[in-house]
């Protein structure tokens, strides 16, 4: 797999969970002998929802809810077959979305 790289993109609502998952991935990859670039924090996506508190009237009384999506990017340079195998066996929390690309 010489000359290739693997790009891993992580997304989660909780920043502590995503940081611990990124740390696990980096530790696993460095143990197999591949080079790692990252984790690079990408901009946090923030969705704000405005809801009227009353079911009938009082439109001036509103409540705001927000949902933040934290993102991290990890590049694995010069991966070995052992690296790919260890990444497939890695157990990460359910709240983390993982997207793996081979550009």
UniProtKB/Swiss-Prot annotation:
It comes from Cutibacterium acnes (strain DSM 16379 / KPA171202). Keywords: Ribonucleoprotein, Ribosomal protein. The keyword Ribosomal protein applies. One of its GO terms (cellular component) is ribosome. One of its GO terms (biological process) is translation. Involved in the binding of tRNA to the ribosomes. InterPro entries: Ribosomal_uS10, Ribosomal_uS10_CS, Ribosomal_uS10_dom, Ribosomal_uS10_dom_sf. Part of the 30S ribosomal subunit. GO terms for molecular function: structural constituent of ribosome; tRNA binding. The keyword RNA-binding does not apply. This is Small ribosomal subunit protein uS10. Pfam families: Ribosomal_S10 (PF00338). Belongs to the universal ribosomal protein uS10 family.
